[in-house]
Amino acid sequence: PFERLSKELAGITPAVIQAILSGGPLPDAVAAKSLAYIRSDLVADDDSGTQWALPLPNPLACQWLKVWLLRRNRIHHQEEPILEEYNFALANSAYHCGGLMAIYAAIQQAAMPDVNTGIVERYYASAIQMPALVIGQLSSRSNHHLEKLENKWLAGEYQKKLQQVSVALGTAIPATLNLEQQSYFALGYYQMGAKLNQDKNEHIAAKKAAETTKE
C-alpha cells in the first residue's frame, strides 16, 4: 500500500516540497489523490476486515488528508482541532457523517459476518459524496442489524456510539460534500472505525483474561 500511494503522489512531489518550504497550503491534489486511493482501496476489496475488525483506510493516506486540512485551516484562520482520536466535539457535519458510516458498517459486520457485500464496499463511494441520500438508508438498516446482534455488550456499545455521533451531527446532513468536506468524512470514518476496533479488541482481551483467571 505504501508503494502504491507513493506512486499516486509522485507527480505532485515538487509542489508538496515547495509548500512545505514556503509554509503555504499543500496542493489540493494531495487531498484528491488520497481520497481516490482510500475510496478505491475500500470499495475494491471489502475483505480487509474480519468478523472482529472493520476495514480501515490506509493510515498514511489519512495522515496526508489531516496535514492538508490543518495547513488549509491555518491559512484560512480556521483553527478546528483535528485530534488523533475521534472528536465528538468537532463542529463538522461531514466528519460525523463519516463516523456514522463506520458505526453502521461495524453493526452490519457483527450481525452478518458472512455477507458477501458489506456496507463499506456498497455505499462508501456514494456516502462520501452525497451523505444525505445514504445515511438515512443505513440508519434504517442498522436498526434491523442491531436487533440481530446476540452480543448484548456489543449492541450496547454501538447504540451508545450512534447516540453520541447523532447528537454531534444534529439534523443537518449535507446533501453533497466538497473536497474539504470529503476529507473530513474520510477522517471521521477512519478514526471512528479505529476506535470501534480498539474497543472490541480490548473487550475480547479482558474477557479472555477473566476466563483464564477462573480456570
List PLM regions with ranges.
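Intrinsic-disorder/low-complexity detector
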Residues: 1-215
